[in-house]
Amino acid sequence: MSQMEHRSPGVAAYALAKGRFAEIISDLVHVDATVLLAAYRAIPRLYAITDATAAGMPDGTFEWGGRRVIKKGQRITLENGTTLAGSAVTMLDAFRNLISLGLSLEQAAEMTSTRQAEYLGLQDVGRIEPGARARAFVL
């Protein structure tokens, strides 16, 4: 994605200014915590996503998509060690990250479940209420 600059704002700034729905990788690797909170305050229906490219993998160097990558903690980089290639953060990790940033349980649940269903126009999933399909698990 293009960088956000004051004279050439790019897609991210447009989402902040005009977005009704937008997704954000809530791994604190792709997006800094301060930027994530700013987006949360600016975009009414911001929802969390994760690429989880190496979730569950041990730290180390491995082949992924025809390239050598390095996994260290939650961060995945190309072999040069600086170019971000992904993260190992699951949606549960993203939920925990949102809580760690000060969002309430309800706000974090909305960002990791409810809003995706709303975006897709699904009325019977993503929430716990009468008539909704039961898809709950204990965290």
Question: What do these predicted regions represent?
Answer:
Residues M1-T112, Y119-Q123:
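Active-site-adjacent C-terminal substructures of enzyme catalytic domains
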Residues E118, D124-L139:
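C-terminal cap of metal-dependent C-N hydrolases
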Residues T112-S113, A132:
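A general structural motif at alpha-helix termini
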